[in-house]
Design a protein with these regions (language model features):
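Short loop/turn motifs that connect adjacent beta-strands in outer-membrane beta-barrel proteins
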Residues: 139-142, 171-172, 224-229, 269-277, ...
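Outer-membrane beta-barrel signature, preferentially recognizing the C-terminal barrel domain
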Residues: 417-482, 518, 523-538, 545-548, ...
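Outer-membrane beta-barrel transmembrane domain signature of Gram-negative proteins
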Residues: 282, 287-377, 577-603, 614
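A beta-strand signature from Gram-negative outer-membrane beta-barrel systems
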Residues: 95, 104-142
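Short, acidic, small-residue-rich periplasmic hinge/interaction motif at the N-terminus
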Residues: 12-62
Length: 721
């Protein structure tokens, strides 16, 4: 007898079990005895604990035109309108460090599963986070290289980069070696037609964008140890940048050098019914600056992450699953200036746990299950202790699938979040000059911003609530939609100055530097704590793909996936300091924001040709000079739209064939011939436009004022060796 699993693909695992005896079946403890001679069992390799809400096969992944898995995840995050970075699992399991797989080529992926909200608690994710399951090829190997040349059509700021990569997967063993180099030419003031701004860059040697050189290397390996799996990573990077600025009438040359070395070691496996993961990571970095201020800084950090999950109780409707996790992190930062030396030590200790309880399971046998469908509640909590104080986290959620193709979910979280090491310890430095509208003087000026971290940041406290409805997929087009509502309230939220309005300068006068004539020359844009904020909005995401013939190879059938996202802000308010009035940013107080935004994308591939196109639009908005009332000196920005386009051509046909089991590369989806990519960002060279409240032209919003780059053409040559 042969037992078939419906919808099983050629990539599924197949086990052949001959002549199973009665005693063997009874001893296995897997239920009632079935007397069969031979059994063929088929099951999906790498399947997650729950079925996917959305699945992309190899052809759809290749149509994204991505260089690596990290770019694939970025594209998915945009298409699905995810508010947070997704939690990534590999082959249906949590691994110690999923990030080590981010540099692998996209065709190392067999399929991608976007899991429903119920998976978040099952895998220990943060409330509201989406879980993405990446199923890798069983056997895979490649040598890849590419050269990328980009240049604005207006000239200047050319960029040249190169990548080399060696990757391999053999069962549970995997490794990758990668090297990247890049050089960015400076953009000089003389290369742009800009009107002279008060106190601005009249010298043609002044750089509007710095020159930058970067070299980075990465090595990762994953190895099995009996029932365990270990992962090791080592990465290094060096970066240098040079710039020339006009600061208070003086020409200042600046040179920054950054070097970093990082590594991690992790292990995952099962013991005593628990699925366990642990990861130890560390990094050392050094930065040096000459020019605006002489000095150097050093930073060392060490972190340990532990997590575990297991099923506590098996109920008729499913198992009660718990997830526990802990995080220990410490860092030391030293900043050495010409006349001072300061050392800071930061630490974070946190632990959290979740409990997922199934209340109902859809089936045809129980009346309650038929009426209610799948229903699960999630409860969670945590404690956090760090340098700035401590806090707690409480969360809850509900996931309900009353019918096939319909899933409703909600999530609520109240927490005190930790402050990242980078936000606190990064040394301050002067960035590239930029044009800003000075509301106090009513003129456009060129300022030199102060960037970096802020050691005085306090842990923010936030409360989040979300509702989401997911529909589909329906029809042969795989039509699917997500409709969501989000509300976030924060106290001591971390942000930057919203805009350079009178309200903002009155609240933070120490962050504005003016010369003897009162002209604005520099603004401190390092992160700071805002007293309180409230954001409320709606999101909509629709995805569908062109139907393909069953069994057609990806080079024989057209692959096309469409996505459409729409965002609407209902409320956006902020109080800069305690005791100061609340500013309504949708009305333009304290720096206006767009109420609506829209994004559409198309990813298509047929044979040797590929097309990736996207269009984005955001509504216009007003920024008030003084909060609470419109003024003729307000800044009114027009709606903005831009289109990006990418064409891909493979020099020879990339026929897909199923490799023999002894062949190292596995099923091939990419040939070794040269691939040429031509990409145009901002196809129609759109630039921000604005006017004043009285209808006159706004200073600082000429063609080359706010957007110095405009349309960029990028040519990529890549090949598999």
């Amino acid at each position: 007898m042969i037992l078939e699993v419906l919808n099983a693909s050629s990539a599924d695992e197949v086990f052949f079990v001959p002549n199973i005896s009665e005693q063997q079946v009874a001893d296995s403890g897997h239920g009632d005895l079935v007397d069969v001679e031979d059994v063929l069992v088929q099951g999906r390799r790498g399947a997650a604990r729950v079925g996917p809400a959305l699945e992309l096969d190899g052809a759809e992944i290749d149509a994204l035109g991505a260089w690596d898995i990290a770019e694939v995840l970025t594209r998915l995050t945009e298409a699905l309108e995810l508010s947070e970075q997704p939690m990534v699992i590999i082959n249906g399991k949590i691994v110690a460090s999923a990030g080590v797989f981010s540099s692998f080529p996209p065709d190392a992926i067999m399929r991608i599963e976007v899991l429903p909200p119920a998976a978040t608690a099952l895998y220990g994710g943060v409330s509201g986070q989406t879980v993405i399951n990446i199923v890798l090829q069983r056997r895979y190997a490649s040598y890849d290289g590419r050269i990328v040349l980009s240049r604005p059509t207006q000239g200047g700021a050319s960029s040249l980069s190169s990548d080399l990569r060696r990757s391999s997967i053999v069962g549970d063993r995997a490794y990758i070696l990668s090297l990247r180099t890049s050089h960015d030419d400076p953009l000089r003031a003389g290369e742009r037609d800009r009107m002279t701004l008060g106190g601005g860059s009249e010298d043609h040697e002044v750089t509007l964008r710095p020159s930058t050189d970067l070299i980075s290397a990465n090595a990762s390996v994953t190895l099995p140890f009996r029932e365990l799996s270990g992962v090791f990573n080592l990465n290094a990077q060096t970066r240098e940048s040079r710039s020339v600025a006009n600061y208070a009438g003086e020409i200042v040359e600046s040179h920054r050098r950054n070097k970093s070395l990082g590594g991690s070691a992790g292990i995952s496996g099962s013991a005593y019914g628990w699925s366990l993961q642990g990861n130890l990571n560390g990094q050392v970095s050094r930065a040096q600056e000459d020019g605006f201020q002489e000095g150097h800084s050093e930073n060392q950090s060490l972190g340990l992450n532990l997590s575990g999950s297991r099923s506590l109780i098996d109920l008729p409707m499913g198992g009660v699953v718990t997830n526990l996790s802990g995080n220990l992190m410490t860092s030391r930062s030293t900043v050495d200036r010409a006349q001072s030396r300061a050392t800071s030590v930061f630490y974070t200790r946190e632990g959290r746990g979740t409990l997922a309880i199934p209340l109902s399971k859809a089936n045809d046998e129980a009346m309650f299950g038929r009426l209610v469908g799948d229903l699960q509640i999630v409860m969670g909590g945590g404690v956090r202790l760090n340098t700035g104080g401590g806090g707690e986290e409480v969360s809850g959620g509900l996931d309900w699938a009353p019918r096939k193709g319909l899933r409703l979910s909600s999530a609520w979280t109240a927490s005190t979040d930790s402050v990242s090491d980078l936000l606190r310890s990064e040394p301050s430095y002067h960035g590239a000059p930029r044009v800003a509208f000075d509301f106090r003087a009513g003129e456009a000026v060129e300022i030199v911003p102060i960037l970096g971290g802020n050691p005085d940041l306090k842990p923010p406290r936030s409360e989040r609530f979300s509702l989401n409805a997911a529909l589909g997929p329906f029809t042969s087009w795989g039509m699917a939609g997500n409709f969501g509502y989000q509300k976030t309230e924060a106290t001591n939220g971390i942000g930057v100055l919203p805009d350079l309005t009178s309200d903002v300068e009155a609240a933070f006068p120490e962050r504005f530097e003016r010369d003897g004539n009162g002209r604005l020359i520099s603004v401190d844009l390092r992160p700071l704590n805002l007293s309180s904020s409230l954001m409320e909005g709606l999101t909509t995401a629709v995805n569908f793909s062109l139907p393909r013939p069953q069994g057609a190879a990806s080079n024989e059938a057209m692959v096309a996936r469409f996505s459409l996202n729409y965002n609407l802000q209902l409320r956006n308010t902020v109080a800069l300091l305690e005791g100061r009035p609340e500013l309504d940013r949708l009305k333009g107080d304290g720096g206006g924001v767009s109420r609506q935004s829209l994004r559409a994308a198309l990813d298509a591939k047929r044979g040797r040709w590929g097309l990736n196109a996207s269009a984005r639009w955001q509504d216009g908005y007003r920024t008030r000079r003084n909060g609470g009332r419109d003024d003729q000196a307000d800044l009114v920005l027009k709606s903005f739209a831009a289109v990006d386009l990418k064409l891909t051509f493979q020099m020879s046909s990339s026929s897909i064939r199923a490799s023999a089991s002894s062949e190292e590369g596995g099923p091939r989806r990419r040939s070794s011939s040269l691939q040429v990519n031509l990409e145009v960002e901002n196809l129609f060279d759109a630039r921000p436009e604005a006017r004043l409240g009285d209808g006159s032209a706004a200073p600082g919003y000429g063609r080359d004022a706010q957007d110095l780059i405009g349309r960029v053409v990028r040519l990529t040559l890549q090949r598999r060796f």
